[in-house]
């Protein structure tokens, strides 16, 4: 069980809110109506499944009017991440070599799909900055992804839905690695 942090903004004074979460049209969480102007909340001890799509629904009351909103979200990988690090295994011979200019590294994977998938997610992380492309289109709107963390304590990964980028037949995924703090 994990906490969920939810935030929203309201263009007028908020009097109350009510949150619900659905999976496949089934309600998996329904909170009580809360009289509050809070717009950042923590929901503790949710029993959500890993790598699963949900819809968060919110009902906001403001000046006796009711507003509705919803947002899709996907839970991440729970527990130990079993991915494999990709590296060129170059070792630094001298520390000053770390600061030399280098071209960005490109990682490429070609594969074929017999049909376009209904869902396709990628979980990706870089120890430094990266951009992700599928079939020549940049995935997401962020530039130079990856949040900095103390890598000995934890590493954040990003999740992208690739369904709209993939095609039946030949596909190409490539990642451009930035010349950053994990240069070698």
Regions found by a protein language model. Give the residues of each.
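Surface-exposed coil/turn segments at beta-strand junctions on protein surfaces, enriched
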Residues: 34-38, 47-51, 100-102, 115, ...
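Recognizes extended acidic, P/S/T-rich segments that occur
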Residues: 14-53, 63, 67
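Low-complexity, Pro/Ser/Thr- and charge-rich linker/hinge segments at domain boundaries
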Residues: 73-96
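Structural beta-strand segments of beta-rich domains
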Residues: 2-6, 118-120
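Extracellular fibronectin type III
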Residues: 65-75
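Beta-strand-rich interaction surfaces with strong enrichment in secreted/lumenal proteins
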Residues: 30-33, 44-46, 96-99, 109, ...
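Aromatic/hydrophobic beta-strand junction motif of beta-rich domains
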Residues: 6-10, 124
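Accessory beta-strand-rich segments of carbohydrate-active enzymes
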Residues: 53-55, 62, 76-79, 107-184
